[in-house]
Structure formats: structure tokens, C-alpha cells
Amino acid sequence: NNLNSKTPMGFFDFMTEDIAIDLGTANTLIIHNDKVVIDSPSIVARDRISGKIIAVGKEANMMQGKTHENIKTIRPLKDGVIADFDASEQMIKMFIKSIPALKKKLFTPALRMVICIPSGITEVEMRAVKESAERVNGKEVYLIHEPMAAAIGIGLDIMQPKGNMIVDIGGGTTEIAV
């Protein structure tokens, strides 16, 4: 799938949805159709006995410190990167399944995803994010550094040969980029 190709729209392109994900240490945001559709704490609740994830986001956050000892809450991201691979993958999957516009679809759409990643991320961590996205139906997965995404988000012309400083203050990391 080359985005620059001159071929007509593929027959199944109508079954592809575009989403952008900002996986943060404190919060996860998902954008679909130019709207923030998920803005939720990056936290999961796991049943200690079965190992099953029973809640994510706001619901899991409300359980923190208030449930019996068989339910443990986990923040699957540390310093902006995946610390608990399985928990973060389940969290992403459950967040995507809760996107209102995608719930109404007859078929599960293929997803074209743009995911924000911190600048200091390693190749292994990048691969973990990409593989996680592919397992939750990401057919095309693009990774973009958070300061670059912030620059584009505020409308800076990133192709212009002029310097700008971006300060991205997150829940787990702060990045400064020029």
C-alpha cells in the first residue's frame, strides 16, 4: 500500500479507518475523524488469579486502591514507553473497541494508525509498539516522534527551513526539540 501511488482507490479502502494514538504514561488519547474519541488514563485492572484484563482507562482508574486484593491496577507505560507489553496491548485493543463510530461498523475495519512515540525510544521499544498495533488490526502503522506530532498539531509548517522549539510536557516525560 503506497500512499503516493496513482492507482484508483482499492475496493476495500472503504473498510479502512484512520486513527491517531498518543500513548502516554498518564493518559492515552485516540483521534478518529479529527475528533478526540478516547481521552482516558493509561491504566488497566487485571485479575491476579486469571491474569485477565477486566477494565481499562477511567473504569480501571476508579478501581485503583478500592478493590479486593485479587484485582491489581497497572500502569503499562513507564517514561512514555511500554513497560508491560501484554497489558498495554490489551489496553489499546479495549480502547479501540470502545470508539463509538467503529462500534457501529458491520465488519471490523482495518486500521491505518499513526502512533506518537518519545524521541528517546529504542528500536526494540519501537518494534513493540508497532507489533502491538498490528495485533489490534493495524494494517498500516506509522510511528511519529511526539515533538514532531506536537509541531504538526499546532499548525507549524515543518517543511519550512526555519527553526522552532517545541516543548512537549507529558505525564511521564518532557521533551524539548528544535
Regions found by a protein language model. Name each.
Residues 1-171, 177-178:
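Nucleotide/phosphate-binding catalytic cleft detector across ATP-hydrolyzing
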